[in-house]
Amino acid sequence: MLDDKNFLKNIELNWDNEEKAKNFLYNLLKCRVLFDKYILKREFIKDCKENGKWSLQRLEAYQDEKNGKSLKPKYIGTFSGDDNNKKLRTLQACLRITYTSPKTMHWISLVLKNLIYDENNDLLKILEDYCVKKVKESNYEQASGFAFERIVFTYLDYILYRDGYSYKGKSIISK
């Protein structure tokens, strides 16, 4: 992965011959495509122009019948509207509001690292495992007051969304 502190060293290491340079550029472009396709972003359109809404979209080509059947780009949902897509969007939103600084968005590097080798990796499992690890590392058992890390609360929100919640036989949060 690229590290801004060592960017010039990385460039130097990856440009000392033509094959390395081509491979570096290919992987850089591949990471960009994977980022665009699998990482949640804010979309400012229609009714959401002011605050935006979370979206997970990929670029697809379509034939423009009007202009000589040339290919044109359009964005469509990365996944179908299934339950896993909603869970993945919700979990990524949890991580986006927990880790707001680029210096703390390590989960994005984790996703790209896993996808660059196999795009069929289970992103939901990868991110849920990451969150569980971060919650355990937060020392939440000993924390009180403002010492609780934000991930404890945002991941709990996600779990309640994912699994639902009932109290005394009454559904409070449904799946």
Report the location of each language-model feature.
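Flexible coil/loop and intrinsically disordered segments
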Residues: M1-K175
